[in-house]
Amino acid sequence: NGWNDNKTFILIGSASWAALVLLVGSLNSFVI
């Protein structure tokens, strides 16, 4: 069970990190 929670946490973390990178990238392209 602990491993499942860990996997879900990693999945959510990497997904939100990718979304953050995309957001910053699009903001940079708008500013430039």
From Swiss-Prot:
Q: What SUPFAM superfamilies does this protein's entry cite? A: PsbZ-like
Could you provide one GO biological process annotation from this protein's UniProt record?
A: photosynthesis
- Would I find Thylakoid among this entry's keywords? yes
Q: Where is this protein chiefly located?
A: plastid
Q: Which domain of life is it from?
A: Eukaryota
Q: Does the keyword Plastid apply?
A: yes
According to its UniProt record, where is this protein located? Plastid, Chloroplast thylakoid membrane
Which Gene Ontology cellular component terms are annotated?
A: chloroplast thylakoid membrane; photosystem II reaction center
Keywords (A to Z) from UniProt:
Chloroplast, Membrane, Photosynthesis, Photosystem II, Plastid, Reaction center, Thylakoid, Transmembrane, Transmembrane helix
| Membrane-topology annotation of the record | Multi-pass membrane protein
| Record field: transmembrane | 9-31
Job of this protein:
May control the interaction of photosystem II (PSII) cores with the light-harvesting antenna, regulates electron flow through the 2 photosystem reaction centers. PSII is a light-driven water plastoquinone oxidoreductase, using light energy to abstract electrons from H(2)O, generating a proton gradient subsequently used for ATP formation.
Tell me, how does this one assemble? PSII is composed of 1 copy each of membrane proteins PsbA, PsbB, PsbC, PsbD, PsbE, PsbF, PsbH, PsbI, PsbJ, PsbK, PsbL, PsbM, PsbT, PsbY, PsbZ, Psb30/Ycf12, at least 3 peripheral proteins of the oxygen-evolving complex and a large number of cofactors. It forms dimeric complexes.
Family assignment from sequence similarity: Belongs to the PsbZ family.
Recorded protein name is Photosystem II reaction center protein Z
Q: What is the lineage of its organism?
A: Eukaryota, Discoba, Euglenozoa, Euglenida, Spirocuta
